[in-house]
Each structure stands twice: as C-alpha cells, then as structure tokens.
Design a protein with these regions (language model features):
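Conserved class I S-adenosyl-L-methionine
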Residues: 2-48, 63-67, 146-170
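Class I SAM-dependent methyltransferase SAM/SAH-binding core
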Residues: 55-57, 61-106
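A short acidic, Gly/Pro-enriched loop at the edge of an enzyme's catalytic core
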Residues: 105-117
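A short SAM/SAH-binding and catalytic strip from SAM-dependent methyltransferases
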Residues: 116-129
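A short glycine-rich, Lys/Arg-flanked "PGG" loop and its adjoining helix->strand segment in the class I
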Residues: 129-141
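Short alpha-helix
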Residues: 171-187
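Conserved S-adenosyl-L-methionine
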Residues: 188-199
Length: 215
C-alpha cells in the first residue's frame, strides 16, 4: 500500500495514556459531555453524503465507527487507532467494523480507497499537516472529510490548551482558520465550518466541525 505522507513516531505518552483510560472513556457521562455531540453531527453529514467506504481515524474504543456501521450500514467501515488498549475495546464492540492499528500520518489504505474520512476529538493529537495529506491520498476525487476538533477560545480555554500542550506535546488544537488552510493546502475545498456546542460546563470549549471535499 502506498503512502506519500511524512510520518513521526507517535507520542508514546499519549498512546499509553489512552491505553490506561480505555474503560473510563466508555462511561456514559464522558461520552455525553465530550464525544456525543460532534459524533451526532458527523453521522448526519455522512448520511447526507451517502458515503459507502468510511474510515474513522483516531476511533478510540469504536463508539462512532460502530454507530456508523449500525445506523448507516455502508459497504465498509474502518476504525483506525494508535492505541492497542482502545482497539481491544473496539473489537469487542462490533465485529462488522474492520479495526486497524495505525496512525493518522501513515494510513493502511491504497490511494483513493475511501470515499469518506472522519475524525472527532482526536485531530489535536495528530501531526496535522501529515494527517490531512494522508486523508487526501486515500480519498478518491469528491471524497468527504469531516474533522471535529475542540476550539479553544477565551482565557480559560487557552490555559487548558497550554497545560495540554505541555503534558502531551505535540498535541495542538488548531484555530478554525488553521484547519481550513490545512485542508486547502492538501487539496480539499472547504464546504462548511461551524461550532458544535457540548452540554454545560463544556460549552466553554465547543467543538468546531469542518467539512472538506477532495478536489
């Protein structure tokens, strides 16, 4: 399988942390507050796009990928994650999803193999330029990318981002304009970008969802 994207050694601190947090990640409160709102928006976009070969990058314990398979029933669904602990949980969740151990910067797909890529609340952990280059490589012309990432604005949110950056470097939540620029540089037309609010208290740090179409 071909790959033109540069790669990096995936941050072992991040991977190890998510291995340890895999069971906590699945709790109802964590999912409802942090993850469910952008996942709902992502599924709605995939439904509108009628996507048939979909990969969830940074899939974690597989909740979104399993929902995509169950609710949309596309031809193929792939869940990709760099954390073995997360993937262990995911494999037990849905055997109809193909679960793959890999990083966003070096995806295990042929050129043009997919028609949609999604990533929710994980993009800040990627080498973002390398990742979107890979997204463009594995998507066919007209393929959809959906990126939902936390948007840090205001002094409290910026302080949280600084702590995250110091603890989990090279993690970085891009500003909305950065995400648009990354996609355009990689060969995407930006279709839409909007905030997705979580329940309180996490309205302080909303998600921004960005949609791109492969040129």
């Amino acid at each position: 399988m071909n790959s033109t994207a540069p790669t990096r050694g995936f941050n072992e601190v991040i991977t190890g942390s998510f291995d340890r947090l895999a069971r906590v990640y699945d709790t109802a409160l964590v999912q409802q507050v942090f993850y469910r709102p952008p996942q709902d928006e992502t599924i709605a976009e995939l439904r509108r796009n009628r996507s048939r070969r979909i990969a969830d990058i940074g899939c974690g314990t597989g909740i979104l990928a399993a929902r995509i398979q169950r609710e949309l029933q596309p031809d193929q669904v792939f869940g990709v994650d760099a954390s073995p602990g997360m993937l262990e949980q995911a494999r037990a969740r849905n055997p109809l999803v193909t679960w793959l151990h890999s990083t966003a910067e070096s995806l295990p797909f042929d050129d043009g193999a997919l028609d949609a890529i999604v990533t929710t609340t994980a993009f800040h952990f990627f080498d973002q330029r390398a990742a979107v280059t890979e997204f463009a490589r594995v998507l066919g012309a007209g393929g959809l990318v959906v990126i939902a990432t936390m948007h840090y604005s205001g002094p409290l949110a910026r302080g949280i981002q600084q702590v995250t950056r110091n603890s989990f470097a090279p993690a970085h939540a891009p500003a909305p304009g950065e995400t648009r620029e990354l996609l355009r540089d990689a060969g995407f037309d930006v279709l839409d970008q909007r905030k997705v609010h979580r329940p309180l208290p996490n309205r302080l740090i909303p998600d921004v969802i960005t949609l791109g179409r492969r040129r």
